[in-house]
Amino acid sequence: IVPNPRPMAEVTYAEIRELSYMGASVLHDEAMAPVREVGIPVNIRNTNEPEHPGTRIVAELSPEVIQSTQIAGVAGKSNFAMITIGKHLMNREVGFVYRLLGVLEHNDIPFEHCPSAIDSVSVVLESRWLEGRVDGLLDEIRRTLEPDELEYVPSIALIAIVGEEMARTPGIAAKVFSALATAGVNVRLINQGASELNIIVGVAPDDYAPALRAIYNAFIG
C-alpha cells in the first residue's frame, strides 16, 4: 500500500504488539511475550541485507528516537463489521453495555472495539465471526436491549496509529484527521484508550489504502 516504507530503527514491545495485531506481520503479537517479560531486546534484520542495522525492539525508546519521530508506525486491517445500537437515555440504563456484551458472549463472538456516545454504543467485530449469523445476532440484540435504532455495517476497515510518545506530543490527533480530510476520507469510527498508545480510525473499505497512505505521509513519508 505504501511504496518503499521507511524502516523503523527502534520500537517498544508495546508498540510492536499493537502494530502486529493490526496487520504488521513481521512478528506475531504473542511472540513478544517471553522476551518482554525478562526485558531482552530483539533485533529484526533482513536476511538479504544482513549488514543493515534493522529494527530493535526494546523496553524503552532511546532519546535519539524520541526526538526524531512522533509515532512508531501505522498498520491496519479491512476485515471488520460494526453494529451500532442507539437508545434514548442509554446512559441512565444500568448494565446496558454489560447486556450487549452478554449477547456476544452467548454467541461466542469476541469484539475488537466498543466506542460509545451518550445514547449509542458500537461494537466492532471481525467479519469472520458473523458469517451466516448476522440476522440471528441482531434479533437477539433487539430482544435483549430494545434499542430505538440498530445499524449493521457489514464492512469497515480499521487503521491504527501507534506510538508511546503520542501521549506527550500535542497535535497528533489533529495531524491524523487533517491528513484524512485532505485526502477526502470520511471517518466512520474513532477510538483511543486512556493510555494514548494508539488511535484507531475506521473508514470505508474503498478508503482504506488512501487513508493509510495519507496518515503515513503526514508523519513518516
Where are the regions that the model predicts?
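C-terminal catalytic "cap/lid" subdomain
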Residues: 1-221
